[in-house]
A protein has these predicted regions:
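The canonical Cys-X-X-Cys-His
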Residues: 41-48, 102, 106
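Short pre-active-site segment immediately N-terminal to redox-active cysteine/selenocysteine motifs
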Residues: 38-41, 49, 69, 81
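Gly/Gly-Pro-rich "capping" loops immediately C-terminal to redox-active cysteine motifs
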Residues: 46-75
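Short N-terminal segments immediately surrounding and downstream of signal-peptide cleavage
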Residues: 24-40
Length: 113
């Protein structure tokens, strides 16, 4: 049991050093990848509401935005919302699918560090 705990801890530490935009994971929808992208590119604005950025899990803020349609949110994520939201959240290596997964991750409140 102790050996498993040590191995799990080591795997978690190694996983935290992976650059999410260059990960070799085959499943882009994996929550851990979304979390890594969120922490590297989205956290600094969205966690603290910089320039009105909706925080992960802020149901009221996300519901207001979702009323425009999820497609609009994804388009805004991809192309940005000048002057406050840069295109792709500055994650140039992120695919549209990566951004869609991170968007869902934030809407459902899994982004908190």
């Amino acid at each position: 049991m102790l050996r498993q705990a040590v191995l799990f801890s080591m795997a978690a530490m190694l996983g935290s050093t992976i650059n999410p935009a260059h990960s070799d994971q085959t499943n882009p929808g994996e929550p851990s990848k979304a979390r890594k992208i969120y922490l590297e590119y989205c956290f600094s604005c969205h966690e603290f509401g910089v320039n009105g950025a909706p925080a992960p899990g802020d149901k009221e803020a996300w519901d207001t935005r979702l009323s425009q349609g999820r497609e609009v949110l994804l388009r805004n994520t991809i192309f940005g919302m000048p002057p406050v939201m840069p295109p792709r959240g500055l994650c140039e290596a992120c695919t549209d699918s990566d951004l869609e997964v991170v968007l869902d991750f934030m809407i459902h409140g899994a982004g908190g560090a």
